[in-house]
Amino acid sequence: MDSQRNLLVIALLFVSFMIWQAWEQDKNPQPQTQQTTQTTTTAAGSAADQGVPASGQGKMITVKTDVLDLTINTRGGDVEQALLPAYPKELGSNEPFQLLETTPQFIYQAQSGLTGRDGPDNPANGPRPLYNVEKEAFVLADGQNELQVPMTYTDAAGNTFTKTFVFKRGDYAVNVNYSVQNTGEKPLEVSTFGQLKQSVNLPPHRDTGSSNFALHTFRGAAYSTPDEKYEKYKFDTIADNENLNVSSKGGWVAMLQQYFATAWIPRNDGTNNFYTANLGNGIVAIGYKAQPVLVQPGQTGAMTSTLWVGPEIQDKMAAVAPHLDLTVDYGWLWFISQPLFKLLKWIHSFVGNWGFSIIIITFIVRGIMYPLTKAQYTSMAKMRMLQPKIQAMRERLGDDKQRQSQEMMALYKAEKVNPLGGCFPLIIQMPIFLALYYMLMGSIELRHAPFALWIHDLSAQDPYYILPILMGVTMFFIQKMSPTTVTDPMQQKIMTFMPVIFTVFFLWFPSGLVLYYIVSNLVTIIQQQLIYRGLEKRGLHSREKKKS
């Protein structure tokens, strides 16, 4: 085993990862449910079955804060448009990123209201309520830390329902407070609901990067309960009418995409029902319905919920609701990606540049891995020293494969050599590499983050492909500086073209990931020379020119 063959191991792991990722995009597994979960099948238009009404026409009001620009429909009080001024749609653009949208081409809304027996949003009670507002435009003024947008509705019996959106400066969490004033003689039974609905198919103006195999991230629904901290639910699963029906205290429901999310968080002590529904016309929904509340005659009842609409900022999301920060999609290696990001963020607090932070974290990771790297090269050197004995043994035993295997294992044991010792460090390093990939693709802080010179976005591919080429050059130098015992002509050809193959793969990878790999290769070259000097003193390595 030598570093040439190690490249084959890396290639095998890398290709396996790419095949697995492609398979993940195509497969549509049904989510595993726990004791509190029931999977039901509902027909298209099932929003009505859930007691959640369809949208209607009303007057549009606008709400602007320092971080949000929303449009709310007075018919039901749904948020039908959300712009994020702090996040441009594209690098260098003055147009803000649009998260929620209501157009003929695409629907993505955050609906909410009061259902239940006497709720104004109950379809059995007629059309959705048409709220009254005191003005059509609300703006968070300079020096103002909170903005309230009250909307009122009075039903035919004289009961008054008030829905108030509460915005805070610098906050993507919006509280939605409900007040129910019972002026009648019988108790009113109402329950809050929150629903997110979205078109399954993306129009061209929102389908960014789908043709790039290296940029696949999860887009779909998710929910959290005390029993299930974080569960994804694919849009295709909902569209196939295999819907969620979970009863739980606490938790949240959400819709996710790369870097951004919307979520409804019920704020009550009762039981909530989490559900998904196929609404028909290519639109799916995930939502919650709270346990009914009774408002006695002459009394006023109060209820509340919270809407998150914005970027996936982990620390802020964690402060809003337990496990909401898990919506940052780090894949199955989240347990590595999360601490890596925390370390990266801590480094960034000192250096102020995400690219230099990646360089520093690369040195830290490779420093921690140095004992394994040294063990890897030592194992490979011992294997090379055994090659003459192994070759002589093969010639002596001829075609007796069983004897060859037995004597080879005895030789390894006598010489205290582990034939797989050179592979273990690579197997350990590969998850770190993949975790960094997920971290770069899922962390909003790295979106449009510049490095230096021509690299203006570490989360995007190098526009001039300079970094991938440099990465290929460093791989070539590592290959040329590494001793080899490969004699098979086919293997030699594969080794020769390996840097080229990897360069082609990395053309579409995020610049930050390629930067990590370049620095890691440079560290490998330095560590390689230091280790070889130590091996020379032990007689395990010679400076003979490498044969090509």
Curated annotation (Swiss-Prot):
Quote the protein name from its UniProt record.
Membrane protein insertase YidC
Query: Subunit info?
Result: Interacts with the Sec translocase complex via SecD. Specifically interacts with transmembrane segments of nascent integral membrane proteins during membrane integration.
InterPro entries for this protein:
Membr_insert_YidC, Membr_insert_YidC_N, YidC/ALB3/OXA1/COX18, YidC/Oxa/ALB_C, YidC_ALB_C, YidC_periplasmic_sf
Which residue stretches does the UniProt record annotate as biased composition, category Low complexity? 29-42
What do the Gene Ontology cellular component annotations say?
A: plasma membrane
Q: What is a single Pfam family found in this protein's UniProt entry?
A: 60KD_IMP
* Membrane-crossing segments per the record: 6-26, 350-370, 424-444, 458-478, 499-519
Recorded GO molecular functions are: membrane insertase activity
Q: Where is this region: Disordered?
A: 28-56
